[in-house]
UniProtKB/Swiss-Prot annotation:
NCBIfam families associated with the record: PRK05327.1, rpsD_bact
Source species taxonomy: Eukaryota, Viridiplantae, Streptophyta, Embryophyta, Tracheophyta
Gene assigned in the entry: rps4
GO molecular function: rRNA binding; structural constituent of ribosome
Organism this protein belongs to: Panax ginseng
SUPFAM superfamilies per record: Alpha-L RNA-binding motif
Region entry Disordered, spans: 15-43
Protein name: Small ribosomal subunit protein uS4c
Major localization class: plastid
Protein backbone atom coordinates (compact mmCIF):
# COMPACT_ATOMS: atom_id res chain seq x y z
CA UNK A 1 0.00 0.00 0.00
CA UNK A 2 1.45 3.39 -1.02
CA UNK A 3 1.82 6.52 1.09
CA UNK A 4 -1.45 8.49 1.41
CA UNK A 5 -1.68 11.53 -0.90
CA UNK A 6 -5.43 12.15 -0.82
CA UNK A 7 -7.49 14.88 0.91
CA UNK A 8 -6.01 15.51 4.36
CA UNK A 9 -9.10 17.04 5.96
CA UNK A 10 -11.05 13.88 5.17
CA UNK A 11 -8.60 11.90 7.31
CA UNK A 12 -8.59 14.22 10.32
CA UNK A 13 -12.40 14.39 10.26
CA UNK A 14 -12.44 10.62 10.68
CA UNK A 15 -9.38 10.02 12.88
CA UNK A 16 -8.96 13.30 14.79
CA UNK A 17 -6.02 15.73 14.80
CA UNK A 18 -2.96 14.47 12.89
CA UNK A 19 -0.42 17.30 13.32
CA UNK A 20 2.23 15.48 11.29
CA UNK A 21 -0.08 15.28 8.26
CA UNK A 22 -1.68 18.73 8.44
CA UNK A 23 -1.91 21.63 10.88
CA UNK A 24 -5.67 21.80 10.30
CA UNK A 25 -7.95 20.58 13.07
CA UNK A 26 -11.30 18.79 12.81
CA UNK A 27 -14.33 20.85 13.77
CA UNK A 28 -15.44 20.37 17.37
CA UNK A 29 -17.88 17.50 17.66
CA UNK A 30 -17.27 16.12 14.16
CA UNK A 31 -15.85 12.86 15.54
CA UNK A 32 -18.93 12.45 17.76
CA UNK A 33 -21.24 12.96 14.78
CA UNK A 34 -19.30 10.40 12.76
CA UNK A 35 -19.53 7.91 15.61
CA UNK A 36 -23.27 8.43 16.08
CA UNK A 37 -23.87 7.87 12.35
CA UNK A 38 -21.83 4.67 12.23
CA UNK A 39 -23.08 3.23 15.53
CA UNK A 40 -20.95 1.50 18.13
CA UNK A 41 -17.45 0.69 16.92
CA UNK A 42 -16.19 -2.88 16.97
CA UNK A 43 -12.92 -3.66 18.76
CA UNK A 44 -11.37 -4.42 15.38
CA UNK A 45 -12.34 -0.99 14.04
CA UNK A 46 -10.99 0.75 17.15
CA UNK A 47 -7.63 -0.99 16.70
CA UNK A 48 -7.66 -0.30 12.95
CA UNK A 49 -8.30 3.42 13.46
CA UNK A 50 -5.44 3.72 15.97
CA UNK A 51 -3.16 2.02 13.46
CA UNK A 52 -4.34 4.35 10.67
CA UNK A 53 -3.84 7.35 12.94
CA UNK A 54 -0.21 6.35 13.48
CA UNK A 55 0.35 5.62 9.79
CA UNK A 56 -1.11 8.88 8.47
CA UNK A 57 0.49 11.06 11.16
CA UNK A 58 4.00 9.80 10.37
CA UNK A 59 3.31 9.48 6.62
CA UNK A 60 4.20 5.81 6.32
CA UNK A 61 3.17 3.08 3.93
CA UNK A 62 1.58 -0.02 5.41
CA UNK A 63 4.76 -1.98 4.71
CA UNK A 64 6.95 0.61 6.46
CA UNK A 65 4.79 0.63 9.58
CA UNK A 66 4.74 -3.17 9.73
CA UNK A 67 8.55 -3.16 9.49
CA UNK A 68 8.78 -0.78 12.47
CA UNK A 69 6.35 -2.93 14.48
CA UNK A 70 8.53 -5.98 13.86
CA UNK A 71 11.72 -4.14 14.86
CA UNK A 72 10.02 -2.88 18.04
CA UNK A 73 8.81 -6.40 18.83
CA UNK A 74 12.38 -7.69 18.88
CA UNK A 75 13.69 -4.89 21.12
CA UNK A 76 13.80 -4.86 24.91
CA UNK A 77 10.98 -3.04 26.69
CA UNK A 78 7.38 -2.27 25.78
CA UNK A 79 6.79 -2.91 22.07
CA UNK A 80 4.38 0.03 21.84
CA UNK A 81 6.76 2.52 23.45
CA UNK A 82 9.73 1.32 21.41
CA UNK A 83 7.60 1.69 18.27
CA UNK A 84 6.80 5.32 19.11
CA UNK A 85 10.46 6.04 19.85
CA UNK A 86 11.52 4.60 16.49
CA UNK A 87 8.99 6.76 14.65
CA UNK A 88 9.72 9.90 16.66
CA UNK A 89 13.47 9.62 16.01
CA UNK A 90 13.08 9.58 12.21
CA UNK A 91 14.79 12.59 10.61
CA UNK A 92 11.59 13.84 8.94
CA UNK A 93 9.76 13.81 12.26
CA UNK A 94 12.64 15.50 14.11
CA UNK A 95 12.60 18.36 11.58
CA UNK A 96 8.84 18.68 12.06
CA UNK A 97 9.09 18.67 15.87
CA UNK A 98 11.83 21.33 15.72
CA UNK A 99 9.51 23.56 13.65
CA UNK A 100 11.93 23.50 10.69
CA UNK A 101 9.12 22.08 8.52
CA UNK A 102 5.34 22.70 8.81
CA UNK A 103 4.38 19.01 8.44
CA UNK A 104 6.12 15.65 8.14
CA UNK A 105 5.48 15.53 4.35
CA UNK A 106 7.07 19.00 4.19
CA UNK A 107 10.05 17.74 6.19
CA UNK A 108 10.37 14.76 3.86
CA UNK A 109 10.63 17.13 0.89
CA UNK A 110 13.41 19.10 2.60
CA UNK A 111 15.35 15.88 3.12
CA UNK A 112 14.68 14.45 -0.34
CA UNK A 113 15.80 17.69 -2.00
CA UNK A 114 19.07 17.63 -0.03
CA UNK A 115 18.48 20.74 2.07
CA UNK A 116 19.45 19.05 5.36
CA UNK A 117 22.77 18.11 6.97
CA UNK A 118 23.23 15.72 9.88
CA UNK A 119 26.58 16.15 11.63
CA UNK A 120 27.87 18.16 8.67
CA UNK A 121 26.88 15.67 5.96
CA UNK A 122 23.94 15.79 3.56
CA UNK A 123 21.32 13.17 4.44
CA UNK A 124 18.61 12.59 1.83
CA UNK A 125 16.86 9.65 3.51
CA UNK A 126 13.78 10.79 5.45
CA UNK A 127 13.72 7.61 7.54
CA UNK A 128 17.27 8.19 8.81
CA UNK A 129 17.21 7.30 12.51
CA UNK A 130 18.53 10.20 14.58
CA UNK A 131 20.45 9.49 17.77
CA UNK A 132 21.58 11.48 20.81
CA UNK A 133 24.14 14.21 20.04
CA UNK A 134 23.15 14.45 16.36
CA UNK A 135 23.36 18.01 15.01
CA UNK A 136 20.80 18.84 12.31
CA UNK A 137 21.34 21.94 10.18
CA UNK A 138 20.18 23.54 6.95
CA UNK A 139 22.60 23.61 4.05
CA UNK A 140 24.53 26.86 3.84
CA UNK A 141 22.50 28.01 0.85
CA UNK A 142 19.92 30.78 0.62
CA UNK A 143 17.16 28.54 -0.74
CA UNK A 144 17.56 25.95 2.04
CA UNK A 145 17.58 28.56 4.78
CA UNK A 146 14.63 30.47 3.32
CA UNK A 147 12.46 27.33 3.32
CA UNK A 148 13.29 26.64 6.96
CA UNK A 149 12.93 30.29 8.00
CA UNK A 150 9.43 30.38 6.48
CA UNK A 151 8.46 27.37 8.56
CA UNK A 152 9.99 28.77 11.75
CA UNK A 153 8.17 32.09 11.21
CA UNK A 154 4.80 30.37 10.81
CA UNK A 155 5.23 27.69 13.50
CA UNK A 156 2.96 27.77 16.55
CA UNK A 157 5.97 27.99 18.92
CA UNK A 158 4.70 25.15 21.06
CA UNK A 159 7.04 24.01 23.80
CA UNK A 160 9.79 21.86 22.32
CA UNK A 161 9.99 18.29 23.60
CA UNK A 162 12.81 17.85 26.10
CA UNK A 163 14.90 15.64 23.81
CA UNK A 164 15.40 18.47 21.31
CA UNK A 165 17.04 21.91 21.31
CA UNK A 166 16.55 24.50 18.57
CA UNK A 167 18.94 27.34 17.66
CA UNK A 168 16.73 29.19 15.14
CA UNK A 169 19.24 31.88 14.13
CA UNK A 170 21.75 29.17 13.23
CA UNK A 171 19.12 26.99 11.51
CA UNK A 172 20.29 24.23 13.80
CA UNK A 173 18.66 21.59 15.97
CA UNK A 174 20.24 19.24 18.50
CA UNK A 175 19.06 15.79 19.55
CA UNK A 176 19.75 15.59 23.28
CA UNK A 177 18.43 12.11 24.03
CA UNK A 178 15.98 9.41 22.95
CA UNK A 179 12.45 10.76 23.31
CA UNK A 180 10.42 9.94 26.41
CA UNK A 181 6.98 8.59 25.46
CA UNK A 182 5.19 11.45 27.26
CA UNK A 183 6.64 13.90 24.70
CA UNK A 184 5.24 12.07 21.66
CA UNK A 185 3.40 14.59 19.49
CA UNK A 186 0.29 12.49 18.85
CA UNK A 187 -2.57 11.38 21.06
CA UNK A 188 -2.41 7.63 20.47
CA UNK A 189 -2.95 4.31 22.22
CA UNK A 190 0.08 2.48 20.86
CA UNK A 191 -0.94 -0.80 22.52
CA UNK A 192 -3.97 -0.99 20.23
CA UNK A 193 -1.63 -0.68 17.24
CA UNK A 194 0.51 -3.56 18.51
CA UNK A 195 -2.65 -5.60 19.16
CA UNK A 196 -3.87 -4.90 15.62
CA UNK A 197 -0.73 -6.40 14.10
CA UNK A 198 -0.50 -9.29 16.55
CA UNK A 199 -3.98 -10.39 15.45
CA UNK A 200 -3.05 -10.21 11.76
CA UNK A 201 -0.40 -12.92 12.06
Amino acid sequence: MSRYRGPRFKKIRRLGALPGLTNKRPRAGSDLRNQSRSGKKSQYRIRLEEKQKLRFHYGLTERQLLKYVRIAGKAKGSTGQVLLQLLEMRLDNILFRLGMAPTIPGARQLVNHRHILVNGRIVDIASYRCKPRDIITARDEENSRTLIQNSLDSSSHDELPKHLTLHPFQYKGLVNQIIDSKWVGLKINELLVVEYYSRQT
